[in-house]
Amino acid sequence: MNLRPLHDRVIVKRLDNETKTASGIVIPDAAAEKPDQGEVLAIGPGKKDDKGNPIALDVKVGDRVLFGKYAGQAVKVDGQELLVMREEDIMAVVTK
């Protein structure tokens, strides 16, 4: 299934957290916090200004982003859990 977000919405796939600590202790899924980083899979065309022209988003497909713990709406697509969020819910783009 293909998703095309509307307006300033962004589709993000959470990145997996480490399931083992530095000392080798395995963290069970139930105790692990949800990761606050993800990869942008799709972006909408942007909000519209007063004249109806779209305002481009700052993020692009493939960006690694930081977002709040409770940001976005979780959706399941083809067995994969994704987040649909507004661009304003994204706090930063991770650069290497």
From Swiss-Prot:
Q: Which GO terms describe its cellular component?
A: cytoplasm
Q: What Pfam families does this protein map onto? A: Cpn10
Sorted keywords for this record are:
Chaperone, Cytoplasm
* InterPro entries listed in its UniProt record: Chaperonin_GroES (IPR020818), Chaperonin_GroES_sf (IPR037124), Chaprnonin_Cpn10_CS (IPR018369), GroES-like_sf (IPR011032)
Any single GO molecular-function term of the entry would be:
protein folding chaperone
Is Cytoplasm among this UniProt entry's keywords?
A: yes
What biological process terms from GO does the record include? chaperone cofactor-dependent protein refolding
Span-the-membrane segments of this chain are none
| Places the protein is found | Cytoplasm
Q: What is its main location?
A: cytoplasm
Q: Which domain of life is it from?
A: Bacteria
Its assembly, as annotated, is: Heptamer of 7 subunits arranged in a ring. Interacts with the chaperonin GroEL.
> Matching HAMAP family, A to Z?
CH10
Q: Which PANTHER family match?
A: 10 KDA HEAT SHOCK PROTEIN, CO-CHAPERONIN GROES
NCBIfam families cross-referenced by the UniProt entry: PRK00364.1-2, PRK00364.1-5, PRK00364.2-2, PRK00364.2-4
The role this protein plays is:
Together with the chaperonin GroEL, plays an essential role in assisting protein folding. The GroEL-GroES system forms a nano-cage that allows encapsulation of the non-native substrate proteins and provides a physical environment optimized to promote and accelerate protein folding. GroES binds to the apical surface of the GroEL ring, thereby capping the opening of the GroEL channel.
Name the family.
Belongs to the GroES chaperonin family.
Q: What is this protein called?
A: Co-chaperonin GroES
